Amino acid sequence: MNIHEYQAKEVLHKFNVSVPKGFVATSAEEVKTQVSQLKSDVFVVKAQIHAGGRGKAGGVKLAKSAEEAQQFVKDMIGMTLVTHQTGPSGQQVRKVYVEEGSSIKKEYYLSLVIDPKLSRPIFIFSSEGGMDIEEVAKNSPAKIVKFDIDSATSFDSSKLSSSFHLSPEQIEKITNVAKNIYDAFIATDASQIEINPLVETSSGDFIALDAKINFDDNALYRHPEIMELRDYDEEVKEEIEASKYGLSYIKMDGSIGCMVNGAGLAMATMDIIKYYGAEPANFLDVGGGASKETVTEAFKIILSDSNVKGILVNIFGGIMRCDIIASGIVAAAKEMSIKVPLVVRLSGTNFEEGKKILEESGLNIIAADELGDAAQKIVKEVK
């Protein structure tokens, strides 16, 4: 689960990470009534969306007066912000964060993420803050260091001294920030905390000028206070609907809807669709315990996307029985009067019974025995 920048800063502030003082606004009038609480000659006005690249897209402005800040907020509210992370359709700005300006001496990058190879958190630090860290890694890899940590290992600050020639005082302050975000990471079951930039001010303080936090969806049941931060306006409505039925759904830009059981098989299915010259419209994993009702809801979610011109169902029956899936497919197809081409490939537990159910349904369902054959058939139907 993602949250907004202003929410991430509120979380970090609770764990003693310094952040600029600010407030969130949904209208220019709110700025007029709240801006007096900020003790600054300049104000930073930031559009709040769940995507990076806001600055380049015009979503971050420096205001030199309260009146200018008010005007920036007025301009931003309701605008559609298109960044490299939003896709071409962009995201509508519904909230704006106004904060005190900071006197910046130097910008750094600091994040805490899960390393999939090590299966534990690692710190990433760079002297090139305020930039896309992927670009830094590509163009200046020597300016990035990683700190492998576990519960028995402290933050190895010696790497900061040897790699970036920081003073003992700077290292101590950065180490304190790192320890505080580690505490926040563990306490909230986060999957990522990113401070970019971590700013050293002219007075020598270190503050989080921007912050991003992602949380582990599987641990949200333990954190009702974090669930309250969820902004459904920032999420894809189909993904929200899918979560209600225990389905894992990610919307994509293609024309072939996919219904698969298992994340690995789902990715392989999308790959082979691309291999045969088409694009998947979604990732949809129905899991190992799907019922007829779940399958019906999965079809509804897939077909709610107007770009879908055909559907490929690829099921390998292990825990899940193919006859149950087949019954669900038939029931859903009849209930919804599915008009787009439908290719179904069943393999595994009770697959013969499943194929018989499909054949005797009287519906125009195209059967396939192999994944490659199924992909070619649906691509041919769509094209």
Curated annotation (Swiss-Prot):
InterPro entries: ATP-grasp, ATP-grasp_succ-CoA_synth-type, ATP_grasp_subdomain_1, Succ-CoA_synthase_bsu_CS, SUCC_ACL_C, Succ_CoA_ligase-like_bsu, Succinyl-CoA_synth-like. Keywords: ATP-binding, Ligase, Magnesium, Metal-binding, Nucleotide-binding, Tricarboxylic acid cycle. Mg(2+) binds at N196, D210. It is an enzyme of class 6 (ligase). One of its GO terms (molecular function) is magnesium ion binding. Binds 1 Mg(2+) ion per subunit. It comes from the Bacteria. Substrate binds at N261, G318, I319, M320. Its cofactor is Mg(2+). GO terms for cellular component: cytosol; succinate-CoA ligase complex. One of its GO terms (biological process) is succinyl-CoA metabolic process. Its EC number is 6.2.1.5. Residues 9-241 form the ATP-grasp domain. ATP binds at K46, G53, R54, G55, E99, S102, E107. It catalyses: succinate + ATP + CoA = succinyl-CoA + ADP + phosphate; GTP + succinate + CoA = succinyl-CoA + GDP + phosphate. Gene3D superfamilies: ATP-grasp fold, A domain, ATP-grasp fold, B domain, Succinyl-CoA synthetase domains. The keyword Nucleotide-binding applies. Pathway: Carbohydrate metabolism; tricarboxylic acid cycle; succinate from succinyl-CoA (ligase route): step 1/1. HAMAP family: Succ_CoA_beta. Succinyl-CoA synthetase functions in the citric acid cycle (TCA), coupling the hydrolysis of succinyl-CoA to the synthesis of either ATP or GTP and thus represents the only step of substrate-level phosphorylation in the TCA. The beta subunit provides nucleotide specificity of the enzyme and binds the substrate succinate, while the binding sites for coenzyme A and phosphate are found in the alpha subunit. NCBIfam families: PRK00696.1, sucCoAbeta. Heterotetramer of two alpha and two beta subunits. PANTHER family: SUCCINATE--COA LIGASE [GDP-FORMING] SUBUNIT BETA, MITOCHONDRIAL, SUCCINYL-COA SYNTHETASE BETA CHAIN. Belongs to the succinate/malate CoA ligase beta subunit family. This is Succinate--CoA ligase [ADP-forming] subunit beta. It comes from Wolbachia sp. subsp. Drosophila simulans (strain wRi).
